[in-house]
Amino acid sequence: MQLDRIAQDLVAALRFYSRLPLPAGRDDPDAFAVPSLNRIAYAIPLAGAVIGLIGAVVLVGALALKLPAFLASVLAVTALVLTTGAFHEDGLADTADGLGGGRDKAQRLAIMRDSRIGTYGGCALILALLLRVAALEALVASAGMFRAALALVVAEAASRAAGVLLLLALPPARADGAGASFGRPSESAGLACALVAALLVVVILVPGFGISTAFAGLIAPLVALFAMMRLSGRLIGGQTGDVAGATQQVAVIVFLLGVLIFPGR
């Protein structure tokens, strides 16, 4: 695959998943159009790594300025939220409200479409942010700032692959939602996405942490994926864009916890 093609697809993925001011490419003249998921699926973990790198730079910079690890972790997570425009956090809140507050499929989907945040969504957001900050702070304490930064980069990459694989594993829960408009990836596109994410995990975590940590990094997103597949499949009979976003949030938390539990060398 040509480097120019990879660069074009990476930019398209970053435009969709972040607020970075990137120009439209040749294949996507409309910067606000939804890109073809089958085309950019393999580039989504790469986009996640770029987004994670922004948080990692903020983390290392804050720690280099002698800020406390807790504050540095808060700033890093804040940078990630600002970079993505709380894209996945919004999906987490909507999913928590819908799955937690609805009595049947129709009501759950209606609640998820409501832009207002309810009790379940608010609690999910608070807990998710706390868990990300706490896990990052603990990683800084146990592994050092540079290894914690590496883990953050890989977590953001691998967790986005989990969201893509959810779209592949389940049918759209409704015909007119974001999950349907973004498209359902083909098996080959999903496999390419998973392989790129796995490659990033191995290439970065094995030298930085060791084989056991890399293995945990491979398993963690799958644990989050299967948990969200089971929950979403049972309660709404499929997937939505919100559930894919929630899967990314759950996956990044489980990933960071996995690295903490299996710290390697």
Swiss-Prot record:
Catalytic reaction equation(s): alpha-ribazole + adenosylcob(III)inamide-GDP = adenosylcob(III)alamin + GMP + H(+); alpha-ribazole 5'-phosphate + adenosylcob(III)inamide-GDP = adenosylcob(III)alamin 5'-phosphate + GMP + H(+)
Presence of the UniProt keyword Transferase in the record: yes
Main location: membrane
Enzyme Commission designation: 2.7.8.26
A single cellular component GO annotation: plasma membrane
This protein's name: Adenosylcobinamide-GDP ribazoletransferase
Protein purpose: Joins adenosylcobinamide-GDP and alpha-ribazole to generate adenosylcobalamin (Ado-cobalamin). Also synthesizes adenosylcobalamin 5'-phosphate from adenosylcobinamide-GDP and alpha-ribazole 5'-phosphate.
The organism's place on the tree of life at top rank: Bacteria
Keyword check for Cell inner membrane: yes
Source organism of this protein record: Xanthobacter autotrophicus (strain ATCC BAA-1158 / Py2)
